[in-house]
Swiss-Prot record:
Active site: E318 (proton donor), H347, K451
Protein keywords: Cytoplasm, Gluconeogenesis, Glycolysis, Isomerase
Task performed by this protein: Catalyzes the reversible isomerization of glucose-6-phosphate to fructose-6-phosphate.
Family named by the database record: Belongs to the GPI family.
Any Gene Ontology biological process: glucose 6-phosphate metabolic process
GO CC terms, sorted: cytosol
Coiled coil: none
Organism annotation: Microcystis aeruginosa (strain NIES-843 / IAM M-2473)
Protein name, as recorded: Glucose-6-phosphate isomerase
Length: 524
């Protein structure tokens, strides 16, 4: 197409939401009328599936659960009053708690106020709050925020070293209450408080399902906030998981919810051209041929949105990365997601995007307003923001000229309302795409398999230590494996004892480290 034809296609396929001032441009995805015609039946089913989901149908058949994260911003849509109360009551509880924290009515022992927040959680319990904090936290928030989102001891130490624990409020988030990484982080943090003779329960709150292990453990903490059974971790940002830390930072959570609600309403339209999430799903389906054959590269041209790609990585990949479809057929679905920010990425991997393997499609996120206040001219007639805009437009054009396709999302500025809308836009797109390819977007059997494998390694470690202690002499790896009845697990045993030796715990190894078969394992 020449430039005038492209301009006409842009106008033909431009979506604009007047209340949100959000634009979605899929004109650089080269689908045609025949392609659209072939998807009509699939999209009609997708629209019906979404309507049924919102009405309370079992959308997660593996776990026999409803999927209700869309109700979080529209409680009136929940199927019954009990569910509506499960949404509205925690929001009221959050607002009251935050008011008391900010005023000092709830304060740490022997201090005037809390000054910092430490969020302990992993996956959806961290990625959403981290994204929102980076995008929306004010320059001088009422409380500064930090995160422990891994079970890495050195990382935990580094985070704790930068916090005034005496005035730090700890939020421990775990839906089940038994996630090892969140539990480990909580125990490490509690230990740090106790070493300083600080009363950990008077600094801690929990976000978890009622009746969970964490809920029971946290009964003497400042308070507990509920997570709902029908909200998954990766779609929990607009539940207490994300709203509590956001509100504590002074972010307007009502505006976040309002933006998401506006977007949800727009995506209930059974008209492809007028439904932005359906348009996104269409573009994804076209680019990957319905099989995830191309990666999704997220390029927000705004520093405050640089964590959006990490947030979307979990939302998209954990939802769509499935071995089997709903009929039990092996399909190996999924879309790989990565990205950082523009224009930084133009000095990193855009070279490959332009001239390397064409195994991706890009999503540019444009923010129209450069900053609060005026900008200086860095060249005659041009500001730094003009350069950023020019680099986005230039990169989009350069990619298109080499048959690299792209989507562009444009918002006026980064506000709570816009962030809520972006979250909803992608949540709904994931749901539509999942319907198009007939998969369950709301379970994660691969994650559970990884957890079980990790548990088996820890069980093997306990057996290793016990056998070496009971034997009383040094053992080589093969003999040790045989003694614990795991002759086929020599490699795993080797890696376990190597780790224990490096941390000077329980066991020691001697011998030629370059030749594992020569190593002798004994008690330390």
């Amino acid at each position: 197409m020449d430039n005038l034809q492209l301009w006409q296609r842009y106008q033909d396929w431009l979506y604009y939401h007047p209340n949100l001032e959000l634009y979605l441009d899929v004109s650089r995805i080269p689908f045609d009328e025949a392609f659209l015609k072939g998807l009509e039946a699939k999209f009609e089913r997708a629209f019906q599936d979404m309507a049924a989901l919102e009405q309370g149908a079992i959308a997660n058949p593996d776990e026999q659960r409803m999927v209700g994260h869309y109700w979080l911003r529209a409680p009136e849509l929940a199927p019954n009053q009990e569910l509506r109360d499960e949404i509205t009551e925690p929001i009221a509880q959050i607002k009251e708690f935050v008011k008391k924290i900010h005023s000092g009515a709830i304060k740490p022992p022997n201090r005037a106020k809390f000054s910092h927040i430490l969020c302990v959680g992993i996956g959806g319990s961290a990625l959403g709050p981290q994204f929102v904090a980076e995008a929306l936290s004010p320059l001088n928030p009422p409380l500064e925020i930090a995160f422990i989102d891994n079970t890495d001891p050195k990382g935990i130490d580094r985070t704790l070293a930068h916090l005034p624990l005496a005035t730090t409020l700890v939020i421990v988030t775990s839906k089940s209450g038994g996630t090892p990484e969140a539990r480990n982080g909580m125990l490490e943090v509690r230990n740090a408080y106790e070493k300083l003779d600080l009363d950990f329960p008077q600094h801690a709150v929990a976000v978890t399902m009622p009746g969970s292990q964490l809920d029971k453990y946290a009964q003497d903490w400042l308070t507990r906030f509920p997570m709902q059974d029908w909200v998954g971790g990766r779609t929990s940002e607009l539940s207490a998981v994300g709203l509590l830390p956001a509100a504590l930072q002074g972010i307007d959570i009502d505006e976040m919810l309002a933006g998401a609600k506006e977007m949800d309403m727009a995506t209930r339209v059974h008209n492809l051209k007028k439904n932005p999430s359906a348009l996104l799903a269409l573009a994804w389906y076209h680019e990957g041929k319905g099989k995830g054959e191309k990666d999704m590269v997220i390029l927000p041209y705004k520093d405050s949105l640089y964590l959006f790609s990490r947030y979307l990585q979990q939302l998209v990949m954990e939802s769509l990365g499935k071995e089997k479809d709903l009929d039990g057929n092996k399909v190996y679905q999924g879309i790989a997601v990565y990205g950082n920010k523009g224009s930084t990425d133009q000095h990193a991997y855009v070279q490959q995007l332009r001239e390397g393997v064409p195994n991706f499609f890009a999503t540019f996120i444009e923010v129209l307003k450069d900053r609060q206040g005026d900008s200086i001219e860095v060249e005659t007639g041009s500001t730094a923001g003009d350069f950023l805009s020019g680099l986005l437009q230039g990169t989009r054009q350069a990619l298109y000229e080499n048959s690299r396709h792209s989507i562009t999302i444009t918002i006026p500025e980064v506000t709570p309302r816009q962030v809520g809308a972006l979250i909803a836009l992608y949540e709904r797109a994931v749901s539509f795409y999942a319907s198009l390819v007939n998969i369950n977007a709301y379970h994660q059997p691969g994650v559970e398999a990884g957890k079980k494998a990790a548990a088996s390694i820890l069980d093997l470690q306990r057996k290793i230590v016990q056998v070496v202690r009971e034997t009383g002499t040094s053992l080589d790896l093969a003999t040790l494996a045989a003694k614990i009845g795991a002759s086929d697990q020599v490699e795993a045993i080797y890696k376990i004892v190597r780790h224990l030796n490096a941390n000077r715990r329980s066991l020691t190894i001697t011998g030629d480290l370059s030749k594992p078969e020569t190593l002798q394992i004994s008690t330390r």
